[in-house]
């Protein structure tokens, strides 16, 4: 499959279908024989260079013991407040930070404020946005969010990455419904590919998962 700039791609399938494994190949966590970026074999690209362009937000977000500011910048002294505020807004985390005792300087993690699962997920996404990648891969990192927050966050991401590449891995069909392209995996293979409406009509695994999961937000159905 190919992913072009400006495209939102959803990866879905049953548990252990190969979604996360495919995402890991794009970052050279495992060796792949046929992945190219701008027609260049990723095996010929330095890992540090590759990971400066492609950022991956894992299922279990990593929060550092330090301030919100430190978590956004990876403890870098080069802090850009405008970028920080934009990242927090896109990730739907800005209001949470405003309510914290010291704002961006609030200490979180083992030595400070304990964050909920949803807050941890949104902070990890804000950190990725702050790093300004060409490709953002989010691996089932929205599971703790309520439907409205998730919907708004995804729309923010799609707008922000309208000239880049956004890839979201999700077992929850509602998360990626309405994306430009959706790939359905089963047992390590791509079995379906297309937009939501096409896949729904195909009566394949995508359609089956829709029926099993039953509910889609009305806003996403309209897409």
Which residues make up each language-model segment?
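Catalytic Walker B motif of ABC-type/P-loop ATPase nucleotide-binding domains
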Residues: 136-140
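A short, proline-enriched helix->beta-strand linker immediately N-terminal to the Walker B motif
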Residues: 130-134
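Helix-to-loop junction immediately C-terminal to a conserved catalytic motif
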Residues: 26-28
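C-terminal portion of ABC ATPase nucleotide-binding domains
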Residues: 155, 177-223
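ABC ATPase nucleotide-binding domain helical subdomain, centered on the C-loop/LSGGQ "ABC signature"
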Residues: 36, 44, 69-110, 155, ...
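ABC-fold ATPase nucleotide-binding domain signature/coupling loops
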Residues: 2, 32, 94-123, 141, ...
């Amino acid at each position: 499959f190919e992913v072009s700039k400006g495209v939102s791609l959803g990866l879905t399938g049953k548990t252990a279908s190969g979604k996360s494994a495919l995402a890991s190949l794009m970052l050279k966590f495992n060796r792949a024989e046929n992945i190219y970026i701008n027609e260049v074999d990723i095996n010929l690209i330095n890992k540090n260079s590759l990971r400066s362009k492609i950022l991956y937000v894992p299922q279990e977000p990593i929060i550092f013991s330090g301030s919100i500011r430190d978590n956004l910048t990876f403890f870098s002294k080069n802090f850009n407040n405008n970028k920080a505020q934009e990242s927090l807004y896109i990730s739907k985390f800005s209001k949470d930070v405003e309510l914290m005792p010291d704002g961006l300087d609030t200490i979180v993690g083992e030595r400070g404020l304990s964050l909920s699962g949803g807050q941890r997920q949104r902070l990890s996404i804000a950190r990725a946005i702050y790093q300004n990648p060409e490709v953002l891969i989010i691996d089932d990192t929205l599971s703790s969010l309520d439907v409205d927050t998730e919907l708004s966050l995804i729309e923010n991401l799609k707008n922000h990455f309208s000239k880049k590449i956004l890839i979201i891995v999700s077992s929850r069909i509602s998360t990626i419904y309405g994306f430009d392209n959706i790939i359905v995996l089963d047992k390590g293979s791509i079995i379906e590919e297309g937009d939501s409406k096409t896949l729904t009509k195909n009566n394949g695994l995508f359609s089956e998962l829709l029926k099993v999961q039953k509910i889609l937000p009305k806003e996403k159905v309209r897409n």
